[in-house]
């Protein structure tokens, strides 16, 4: 059916008694007039109309082809870009920009569930992030906050949580959210415990410090329970072992100052991406935090905005401020200026090797606030890494939904899918940084901004 005939059909349906009854029975919204970037990568739809009925999208068309139901709440998107809600595939809602991890981990565990994690979730939503993958947190707190968001008790994106990291040995003082494994049986038992608790994904790190059999056990057990596995890619051996074990998605572009990935690693990646029967190999490079560090160091007033205070008590805000008072002194970033020049080459290598990149930010790490990390990552991809805006947007919408196995429900603005939609004044395909100030946020049909 053509878009025009489909629009006429919808208009007739809505004008019928059945259509009128449906409109009266459920809250209906109509986003009218904007340029729709639907997530599929095709030409934007000018003068778009998106009809939202309850939590789902009822119809998509144009002003010329799709009538607005009588009594619907009309939301003008004239002069705006309309997009699927953004995904951030690598966040840490248990932290919020504080620079001293030891202090944070000792001071705030009893405030994670009720204060800090809800504040982080709310900030992400206000930034236009309607879905996020939370990679590393206390198990019970992560599940509780995810479920509270899903029940509508906490404003936030739909969260896909990993719970604790799985690794060889937890760093001292981090046992609450890092689980060590000792042998194959223990590796499988830890993953089963996560699966039975209801996590959405398993996060594996430091796999180069584990035995090969342990790494395979983690991945195999996760897959047995229908869970994808993400793994760190800081060091070449982490990548080698992860690929051999069947890791689904790698995180980061490495903390080394090596100018590029070794040839054998690239060859192994290409071997994996050639096996399309296994689906795409996903990779979340998280480059913005490294790339923008020197800018923040030299322009610390950029940290003075109060947007990242949302939901945080004043004493926590002051504690965070104190921790980042001297950006140039932070141990976390001392090697970053030497890493920065390697990022473009590594991104190019990954793209040339057939990897599907995903937008993710490591949001929550020192000076990386949930309120603005995601648009900054998109901006760096386009402005510095040479990635086309449409490709970057699809890496924050369509591809993450596919990676998480939920593309039937989210990731594009399509009839029948959940109404996760954002709108922003201006043309984001020309000026991607317009996403720094999202004007409209709908999640599951509820307007939050």
Predicted segment positions?
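Metal-associated gating/positioning segment near the N- to mid-region
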Residues: 80-148, 172, 213, 234-252
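Active-site core of metal-dependent hydrolases
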Residues: 204-339, 358, 365, 385-386, ...
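Histidine-rich, glycine-flanked metal-binding segment
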Residues: 36, 40-83
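Bacterial N-terminal signal peptides
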Residues: 7-17
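Acidic/histidine-rich helix-loop elements
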Residues: 93-112, 168-185, 254-260, 328-335
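Divalent metal-dependent hydrolysis catalytic cores, especially in the metallo-beta-lactamase
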Residues: 117-140, 157-164, 197-207, 228, ...
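Divalent metal-coordination and catalytic microenvironments
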Residues: 34, 50, 55, 79, ...
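His/Asp/Glu-enriched, well-ordered alpha-helical/loop segment
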Residues: 224, 328-332, 340-427
């Amino acid at each position: 059916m053509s878009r025009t005939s489909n629009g006429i059909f919808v208009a007739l349906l809505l004008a019928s008694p059945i259509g009128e009854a449906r409109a009266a029975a459920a809250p209906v919204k109509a986003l009218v007039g904007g340029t729709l970037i639907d997530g599929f990568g095709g030409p934007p739809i000018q003068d778009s109309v998106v009809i939202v009925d309850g939590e789902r999208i009822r119809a998509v068309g144009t002003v010329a082809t799709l009538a607005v139901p009588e009594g619907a709440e009309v939301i003008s998107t004239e002069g705006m870009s309309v997009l699927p809600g953004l995904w951030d595939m690598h966040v840490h809602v248990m932290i919020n920009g504080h620079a001293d991890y030891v202090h944070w981990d000792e001071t705030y565990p009893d405030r994670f569930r009720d204060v800090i994690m809800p504040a982080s979730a709310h900030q992400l939503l206000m930034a236009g992030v309607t879905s996020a993958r939370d990679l590393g947190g206390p198990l019970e707190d992560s599940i509780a906050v995810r479920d509270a968001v899903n029940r509508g008790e906490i404003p936030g994106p739909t969260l896909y949580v990993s719970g604790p990291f799985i690794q060889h040995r937890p760093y001292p003082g981090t046992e609450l959210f890092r689980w060590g494994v000792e042998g194959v049986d223990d590796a499988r038992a830890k993953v089963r415990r996560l699966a039975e608790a209801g996590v959405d994904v398993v996060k594996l790190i430091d796999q180069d410090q584990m035995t090969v059999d342990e790494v395979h056990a983690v991945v195999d057990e996760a897959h047995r329970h229908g869970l994808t596995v993400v793994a760190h890619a800081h060091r070449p051996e982490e990548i080698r072992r992860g690929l051999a074990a069947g890791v689904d998605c790698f995180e980061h572009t490495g903390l080394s100052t090596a100018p590029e990935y070794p040839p054998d690693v690239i060859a192994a990646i290409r071997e994996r991406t050639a096996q399309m029967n296994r689906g795409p190999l996903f990779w979340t490079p998280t480059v913005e935090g490294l790339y923008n560090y020197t800018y923040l160091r030299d322009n610390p007033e950029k940290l003075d905005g109060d947007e990242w205070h949302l939901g945080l008590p004043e004493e926590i805000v002051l504690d965070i401020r104190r921790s980042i008072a001297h950006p140039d002194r932070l141990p976390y970033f001392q090697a970053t200026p030497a890493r920065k020049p390697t990022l473009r080459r590594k991104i190019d290598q990954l793209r040339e090797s057939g990897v599907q990149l995903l937008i993710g930010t490591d949001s929550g790490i020192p000076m990386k606030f949930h309120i603005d990390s995601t648009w900054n990552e998109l901006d760096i991809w386009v402005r510095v890494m040479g990635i086309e805006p449409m490709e970057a947007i699809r890496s924050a919408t369509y591809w993450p939904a596919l990676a998480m196995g939920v593309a039937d429900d989210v990731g594009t603005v399509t009839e029948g899918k959940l109404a996760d939609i954002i709108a922003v004044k201006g043309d984001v395909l020309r000026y991607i940084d317009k996403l720094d100030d999202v004007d409209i946020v709908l999640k599951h049909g509820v307007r939050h901004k």
